[in-house]
């Protein structure tokens, strides 16, 4: 989105009173997405539940609603909905400090594209392939997966791809919203039956069949930033890889193996320190014993 539009959105955010900055950012993005969705004729049967489901972001500020309605009306031609990433707007409105406090680091598109090319050079795409992003965040991987599959395999129905091949999990309500509305915008489809769930991939029992591909950017949550109760749960479930000062993302390899088909593939972008860290010896052994390593790319 153009920087001048970002500045205008920030002005609207700052005009809202009595709420913390992050809540105001979520609210304004919620309103912008709602206006863009309702203003487009591409969706013959609209699905208002996508917004009702996330009404907890609605601060009910009439002045802000009016300002966003005017903003989207004036700038409708400058915002191409079919290529609009709500998560990218969210990212651009947060400072580095806020991103760090939220623990949300989005993956650059060029790295996502590289990962998809590497995975699909190995794994053939057909209608039976099931792909999971276990910490889907703003939906970047899911959207890029949809775009890649639909463009390289036009014989596959677009709705079928979105509803039967793509799966996501995240612990954050707003991330789920960003993933869903982002897919709606990029698919041009209405009333999608999503397989995107709120939950903790590591500890929640989300009943799904096993996957052909598990791909994504697991959260980097250091030992000091995890609660004692949460660490106890991880110590019990993933004692082989999670101990002492291990990072939470180590557990994603272990859980990923459990949810993967026998001939499945895991592709993660992670911090590189697990390759050398003292407390990652268990993870290195786990990977060596349980996976055939195809490639490690170090972006150092």
Predicted regions and their residues:
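Class I S-adenosyl-L-methionine
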Residues: 2-164, 169-182, 200, 276-283
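Signature of N6-adenine DNA methyltransferases within the class I
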Residues: 106, 110-111, 136, 143, ...
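A generic structural signal for short, solvent-exposed coil/turn residues
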Residues: 123, 160, 188-189, 195, ...
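Conserved beta-strand segments of alpha/beta enzyme cores
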Residues: 165, 193-195, 292-295
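Short secondary-structure junction motifs
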Residues: 126, 191-193, 263
């Amino acid at each position: 989105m153009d920087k001048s539009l970002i500045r205008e959105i920030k002005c609207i955010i700052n005009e809202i009173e009595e709420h913390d900055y992050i809540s105001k950012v979520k609210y304004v993005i919620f309103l912008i997405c709602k206006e863009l969705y309702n203003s487009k004729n591409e969706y013959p049967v609209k699905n208002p539940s996508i917004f009702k489901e996330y009404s907890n972001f609605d601060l009910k500020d009439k002045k802000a609603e009016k300002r966003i309605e005017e903003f989207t009306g004036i700038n409708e031609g400058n915002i191409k909905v079919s290529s609009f990433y709500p998560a990218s707007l969210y990212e651009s409105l947060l400072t580095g400090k806020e991103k760090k406090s939220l623990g949300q680091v989005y993956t650059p598109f060029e790295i996502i594209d590289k990962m998809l090319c590497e995975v699909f050079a190995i794994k053939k795409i057909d209608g039976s392939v099931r792909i999971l992003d276990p910490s889907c965040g703003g939906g970047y991987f899911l959207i890029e997966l949809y775009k890649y599959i639909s463009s390289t395999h036009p014989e596959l129905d677009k709705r079928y791809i979105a509803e039967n091949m793509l799966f996501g999990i995240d612990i954050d309500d707003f991330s789920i919203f960003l993933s869903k509305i982002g897919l709606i915008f990029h698919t041009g489809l209405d009333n999608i039956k999503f397989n995107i769930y709120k939950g903790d991939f590591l500890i929640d029992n989300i009943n799904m069949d096993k996957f052909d591909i598990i791909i994504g950017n697991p959260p980097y949550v250091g030992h000091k930033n995890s609660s004692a109760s949460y660490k106890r749960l991880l110590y019990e479930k993933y004692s082989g890889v999670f101990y002492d000062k291990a990072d939470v993302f180590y557990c994603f390899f272990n859980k990923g193996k459990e949810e993967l088909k026998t001939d499945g593939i895991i592709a993660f972008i992670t911090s590189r320190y697990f390759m050398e860290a003292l407390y990652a010896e268990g993870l290195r052994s786990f990977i060596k014993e349980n996976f055939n390593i195809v490639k490690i790319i170090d972006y150092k």
